[in-house]
């Protein structure tokens, strides 16, 4: 994974809006890109800030040409309407609708009429312009949807096709639960799903808005990486605002990363139109794609995309549960049927790969459920709020010395018992959101409760003159919320037959699309190979990363007298010779590794120094640089008991004679800092014997912790670990510190950490992680699992207060587990934040392990 900052100003492409009041939708044509001055590499700018309007010339023979005509010539491509640059006869020649989009019995064998939208004449097959149902109505063939499922074991393409073409059929606002309507409403989509490869849902990126997610699908990047952090945004360096109704969105400087069509063209693979002007009917878009598929070999693109503004438009208007949603879904399905019938008519239905995919879901939302910041703040006129299903706050006035994000956060935190949003400084947002490392993301962020909106004040809520709300649905919420999930279906010769796969995140699709086209992906946030199980054959075979630093295995026994920790309790060990026995135990490897490192030793992927420390109940990789473990691993059986801690061990720490005193923490640092305490990575409560309990109080098991965070950590170790072990027939737990002071989602180097903890020998982690693994089949114990694994991971923010949980004054049982669920994470997120590599020694294939690493336990109900 490349550092996100590298994507901020590299390869670019414009993406265009389709919002109400703007006469365009997302669009790109393969040869549209022209090199801009001042850029060293990559596809430079598309379009200037001002449209040109020369309309001289004609579209005769040029409708939907793949190459954009440059000034002073007029244009006939799919986006000329958006830039008022079409030839004068574009509508007349290219947007024909006469006699509709289908053949009827009375049209079969008709005399060709060039005014018709599509043809039913005897020569239409040869000319590639038949209506998509021509062979069904006029030749007695069956509709594609009426044919039985067939397993396409190899692509059956006409001569001249170098690779199976890829068609991406993207639908806006398609909530995953819409698929439950089944074949009665969507027979064509249901057939794609049942005959091909599908997931119960696909997770969008946050925010669950259209622009960020469509561009993520195209690039494999998080919004903080590609720069499109919302449908509207302000860039403080540009001092400019990007929004749906303005022309600034046409400026190339907003768009980072390398989208699929540029990846294709840079590697010699032709790409067709990805986006369409909204005035072009869906049927015309399908017919155009089908006509492009009949082009000569040297002109024919290998990748195409169709985009539908539905069902998003209707979902906003009627809400996701409105009975009015049935017709828009039927219309989308009808278009899918036209595509598949058209492919069958061209004998390409066993050749082409089709991806049917959404950008986000839809939730039931109305004006009546709106939180107003004026009920919390007295100065709402001094702030700018990006409102709606999430809130982003900045000062209305630049260089406002009185603007204090922390003070605003304090005034918005836990002020009402029925508060429907939670304020965060962006660096404190759950790491799984990947929504902090971009200057366009404001310092203050409001996570809004599902089904609610946030606005500055009542006057900011737009209603109809009648006073009624003009919308019943919206999206943008936390991307783990089930209503925000969307659809994924893959169908064709390269996808598996009748296969259901686990849910995944849309950052992974870019790599899959590259694999389908035989392309090498540009750097992206996906994990290449994690979706290999979708495909019949895999062109990319991932390999495990090489270990950079191998550990030391301490052999020297330091003298007890060498240590002055300032908190030792060894003088309380009775009898005195027992101390020697306890220390000798520390050099006994025994079966520790087999018992506590069930999936192999984590690899360190950067240069450092660390030691492997064995104990009866756990194993650690101890950092000589950070003076704490990088990881600690232990296995807890279903039968494990939670025991109490003896009084004489509650406030002391033992020296570890295997580690030099100079590489050991000192308790005096904690005694001198009343704001800091310490905790343990292996929980003393789970020690298997009184002797083993002494190992848990070794200084090498100690980590710095704020007293407030210790409440979270102790409850997790004392109660939740045992709970999970009981529920899952045993678990393996790996925990450790995270350092992400610059909140870029990547491991901080030693030099970077020193910048933030100057003057301290013990760096304070920004987060702590925990990876909890068991057998997916709970009838098998964790340490004897021979089937698929199940994993739950957490990245817990290490903060000096628990104000994120408004009921943190209550018993931990009332709030800690909910806090942890909010900060659920993928193993892959933890790997990026620690530069560690987990699960290196298992009987599972490496792609299967990558699938496990990219899984997110959402703790949401079923879709």
UniProtKB/Swiss-Prot annotation:
Task: Report the record's disulfide bonds.
Answer: 59-76, 63-94, 74-87, 80-86, 103-120, 108-138, 118-131, 124-130, 149-195, 157-351, 367-469, 414-806, 567-667, 569-652, 775-785
Residues in the active site?
A: 210
Ranges for the region named Required for secretion are 830-851
What happens on changing residue 316 to Q? Loss of ability to hydrolyze sphingosylphosphorylcholine
- According to its UniProt record, which reaction does this protein catalyse? a 1-O-alkyl-sn-glycero-3-phosphoethanolamine + H2O = a 1-O-alkyl-sn-glycero-3-phosphate + ethanolamine + H(+); a 1-acyl-sn-glycero-3-phosphoethanolamine + H2O = a 1-acyl-sn-glycero-3-phosphate + ethanolamine + H(+); 1-(9Z-octadecenoyl)-sn-glycero-3-phosphoethanolamine + H2O = 1-(9Z-octadecenoyl)-sn-glycero-3-phosphate + ethanolamine + H(+); a 1-O-alkyl-sn-glycero-3-phosphocholine + H2O = a 1-O-alkyl-sn-glycero-3-phosphate + choline + H(+)
Q: Which SUPFAM superfamilies match?
A: Alkaline phosphatase-like, His-Me finger endonucleases, Somatomedin B domain
What triggers its expression? Up-regulated in massively obese subjects with glucose intolerance, and during adipogenesis.
Its cofactor is: Zn(2+); Ca(2+)
Q: Name one GO biological process term.
A: sphingolipid catabolic process
Please name the InterPro entries in this protein's record: Alkaline_phosphatase_core_sf, DNA/RNA_non-sp_Endonuclease_sf, Endo_G_ENPP1-like_dom, ENPP1-3/EXOG-like_nuc-like, His-Me_finger_sf, Phosphodiest/P_Trfase, SMB_chordata, Somatomedin_B-like_dom_sf
Q: Where is this motif: Cell attachment site?
A: 127-129
Q: Where does Zn(2+) 2 bind?
A: 312, 316, 475
- Give the record's PTM text: N-glycosylation, but not furin-cleavage, plays a critical role on secretion and on lysoPLD activity.
Q: How does activity depend on temperature?
A: Isoform 1 and isoform 3 are active from 45 to 60 degrees Celsius.
Regarding pH, the record states: Optimum pH is 9.0 (isoform 1), 8.0 (isoform 3). Isoform 1 is less sensitive to pH. Isoform 1, isoform 2 and isoform 3 all retain some activity at pH 9.5.
Region Phosphodiesterase, as annotated, extends over 145-502
Domain of life where this protein originates: Eukaryota
- Which residues are noted in the entry as 1-hexadecanoyl-sn-glycero-3-phosphate-binding? 210, 231, 312, 475
Q: Which residues bind 1-(9Z-octadecenoyl)-sn-glycero-3-phosphate?
A: 210, 231, 312, 475
Residue ranges of domain SMB in the record: 55-98, 99-143
What role does this protein play?
Secreted lysophospholipase D that hydrolyzes lysophospholipids to produce the signaling molecule lysophosphatidic acid (LPA) in extracellular fluids. Its major substrate is lysophosphatidylcholine. Can also act on sphingosylphosphorylcholine producing sphingosine-1-phosphate, a modulator of cell motility. Can hydrolyze, in vitro, bis-pNPP, to some extent pNP-TMP, and barely ATP. Involved in several motility-related processes such as angiogenesis and neurite outgrowth. Acts as an angiogenic factor by stimulating migration of smooth muscle cells and microtubule formation.
Q: Which family does it belong to?
A: Belongs to the nucleotide pyrophosphatase/phosphodiesterase family.
Q: What is this protein called?
A: Autotaxin
Organism of origin is Homo sapiens
Q: What is the lineage of its organism?
A: Eukaryota, Metazoa, Chordata, Craniata, Vertebrata
């Amino acid at each position: 994974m490349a550092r996100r900052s590298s994507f901020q100003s590299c390869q670019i492409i414009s993406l265009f809006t389709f919002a109400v009041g703007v006469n365009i939708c997302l669009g790109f044509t393969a040869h549209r890109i022209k090199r801009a001055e001042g850029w060293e590499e990559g596809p430079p700018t598309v379009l200037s800030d001002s449209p040109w309007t020369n309309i001289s010339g004609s579209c005769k023979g040029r409708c939907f040409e793949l190459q954009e005509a440059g000034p002073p010539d007029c244009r006939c491509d799919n986006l000329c309407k958006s830039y008022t640059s079409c030839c004068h006869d574009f509508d007349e020649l290219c947007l024909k609708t006469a006699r509709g989009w289908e053949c009827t019995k009375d049209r079969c064998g008709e005399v060709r009429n060039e005014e018709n939208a599509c043809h039913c004449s005897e020569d239409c097959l040869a000319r590639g312009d038949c209506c998509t149902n021509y062979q069904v109505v006029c030749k007695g063939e069956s509709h594609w949807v009426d044919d039985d499922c067939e397993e396409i074991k190899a692509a059956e393409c006409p001569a001249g096709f170098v690779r199976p073409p890829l068609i991406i059929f993207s639908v806006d606002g398609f909530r995953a639960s819409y698929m439950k309507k089944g074949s009665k409403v969507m027979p064509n989509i249901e057939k794609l799903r049942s005959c091909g490869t599908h997931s119960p849902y696909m997770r969008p990126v946050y925010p669950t808005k259209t622009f960020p997610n469509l561009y993520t699908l195209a690039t494999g990047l998080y919004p903080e990486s590609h720069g499109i952090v919302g449908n509207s945004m302000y860039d403080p360096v540009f001092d400019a605002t990007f929004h749906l109704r303005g022309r600034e969105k046409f400026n190339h400087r907003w768009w980072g990363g390398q989208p699929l069509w540029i990846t294709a063209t840079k590697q010699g693979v032709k790409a067709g139109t990805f986006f369409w002007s909204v005035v072009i009917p869906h049927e015309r878009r399908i017919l155009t794609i089908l006509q492009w598929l009949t082009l000569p070999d040297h002109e024919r693109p290998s990748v195409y995309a169709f985009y539908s503004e539905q069902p998003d438009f209707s979902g906003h208007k009627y809400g996701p549960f409105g009975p009015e949603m049935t017709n828009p879904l039927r219309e989308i399905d009808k278009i899918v049927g036209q595509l598949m019938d058209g492919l069958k008519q061209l004998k390409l239905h066993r050749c082409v790969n089709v991806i049917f995919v959404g950008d986000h879901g839809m939730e039931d939302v109305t004006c009546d459920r709106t939180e107003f910041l004026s009920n919390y703040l007295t100065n709402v006129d001094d702030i700018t709020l990006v409102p709606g299903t999430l809130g982003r706050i900045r000062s209305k006035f630049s260089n406002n010395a009185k603007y204090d994000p922390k003070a605003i956060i304090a005034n918005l935190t836990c002020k009402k018992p029925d508060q429907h949003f939670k304020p965060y400084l962006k660096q404190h947002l759950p790491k799984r959101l990947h929504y902090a490392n971009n200057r366009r993301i404001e310092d203050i962020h409001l996570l809004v409760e599902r089904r609610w909106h946030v606005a500055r004040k009542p006057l900011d809520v737009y209603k109809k003159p009648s006073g009624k709300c003009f919308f019943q649905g919206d999206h943008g919420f936390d991307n783990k919320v089930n209503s925000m999930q969307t659809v994924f279906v893959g169908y064709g010769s390269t996808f598996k037959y009748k296969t259901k796969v686990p849910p995944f995140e849309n950052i992974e699709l870019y790599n899959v699309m590259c694999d389908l086209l035989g392309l090498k992906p540009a750097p992206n946030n996906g994990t290449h190979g994690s979706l290999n199980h979708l495909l019949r054959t895999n062109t990319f075979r991932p390999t495990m990363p090489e270990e950079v630093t191998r550990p030391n295995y301490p052999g020297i026994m330091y003298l007890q007298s060498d240590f002055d920790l300032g908190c030792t309790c060894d003088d309380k060990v009775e009898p005195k010779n027992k101390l020697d026995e306890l220390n000798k135990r520390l050099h006994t490897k025994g079966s520790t590794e087999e018992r506590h490192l069930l999936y192999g030793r984590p690899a360190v992927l950067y240069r450092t120094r660390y030691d492997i420390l064995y104990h009866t109940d756990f194993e650690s990789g101890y950092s000589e640089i950070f003076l704490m473990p990088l990881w600690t691993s232990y296995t807890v059986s279903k039968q494990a008991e939670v025991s109490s801690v003896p009084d004489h061990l509650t406030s002391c720490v033992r020296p570890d004679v295997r580690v030099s005193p100079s590489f050991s923490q000192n308790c005096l640092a904690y005694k001198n800092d009343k704001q800091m305490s310490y905790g343990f990575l292996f929980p003393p409560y789970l020690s298997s014997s009184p002797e083993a309990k002494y190992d848990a109080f070794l200084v090498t098991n100690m980590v710095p912790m704020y007293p407030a965070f210790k409440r979270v950590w102790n409850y997790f170790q004392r109660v939740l670990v045992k709970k999970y072990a009981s529920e899952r027939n045993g678990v393996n737990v790996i925990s450790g510190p995270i350092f992400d002071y610059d909140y870029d989602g990547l491991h901080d180097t030693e030099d970077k950490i020193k910048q933030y903890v100057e003057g301290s020998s013990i760096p304070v982690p920004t987060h702590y992680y925990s990876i909890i693994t068991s057998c997916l089949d709970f009838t098998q114990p964790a340490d004897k699992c021979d089937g698929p694994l199940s994993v739950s991971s957490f990245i817990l923010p290490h903060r000096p207060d628990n104000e994120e949980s408004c009921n943190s004054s209550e018993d931990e049982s009332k709030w800690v587990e909910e806090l942890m669920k909010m900060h659920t994470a993928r193993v892959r997120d933890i790997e990026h934040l620690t530069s560690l590599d987990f699960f290196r020694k298992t009987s599972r294939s490496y792609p299967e392990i990558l699938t496990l690493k990219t899984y997110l336990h959402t703790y949401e109900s079923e879709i």
